[in-house]
Amino acid sequence: MRRITTLFLALLLTLSLTACGSTAQPNPPAQTGNDASQTETPDTAPEPAEEPEKPQQEPYVISSPTVDRGTVDGVTYVPWDGVVEHLFFHPIVAYPELAFDGDSQADGIDDWMVTVDEYGKILQSVYDRGYVLVDINDVWSESTDANGQPVMIRNTLYIPEGKKPLIFSYDDVNYYDYMLKDGFTYKLILGEDGLIWSYGLDPQGNEVISQDLDAVTILDKFVREHPDFSPFGAKGSLSLTGYQGILGYRTNTDTKVWNDELEANRLKECEAVKPIIAELKRTGWTF
């Protein structure tokens, strides 16, 4: 709005402006009196202002554990045909004082959820016990039998010697409205550094952007600090119910009242969540 106002005033003062390309130009200082009439049109168009440098995405390698690598960088990979364990999580509690306040949701949260501290201890425990993350899609492959019917085939995994494979999955990654007041984060966002962060409000109502309060960002951070926990780049499988959108973005149409304003907001939310999904997929998360 400021740029439009400045251009309008400049035109009234008969200041000659030269535009170049579609990149926004720095606004010239306001001129008054005779100074404006003496302004000369520049011989050449001004250089476009440089766009802010976008953060460089950290390289992230995703590979398959079904390939026999032998020994790489001193790590020997051996076949694993045993049980592949699975840990399943609901959204984790960022603020226990809001979750366990005695309201109607408190008991259910206590039964089904874990807190940030408990989640961190679980990650450290499975890491210390020699587990490594694998993608469920690498454990099984879809095929067809002699009758043309789809069947699932168990794959042989090749994992670092002495390690055990583990699958993580997460349910209800929608950030439902009813949970927001009960101590959970509100949504996932893409930070200026190109990484995934969580957004929410603390018990005092202050906005908080963090990587220490949400299951997704905590695991991302843990893997960055312990890359051997995910030798193939896998993180976890995110399950969406389709109710109230995805990842905290209200992309849904399941509402009793609908109008053009709601549809415009829904489309805006759809566009906003796309880069979040792309970055999650790029860094080892599946849906």
Give the predicted meaning of each segment.
Residues 1-6, 21:
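Positively charged n-region of N-terminal signal peptides that target proteins for export
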Residues 79-286:
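Active-site beta->alpha N-cap acidic-glycine motif
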Residues 33, 37-85, 96:
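N-terminal low-complexity, Pro/Thr/Ser-rich intrinsically disordered segments
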Residues 21-28:
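Bacterial lipoprotein signal-peptidase II cleavage site
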Residues 16-19:
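C-terminal motif of bacterial Sec signal peptides marking the signal peptidase cleavage site
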Residues 5-14:
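Sec-dependent, cleavable N-terminal signal peptides
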Residues 6, 27, 33, 49, ...:
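Generic hydrophobic/packing signal
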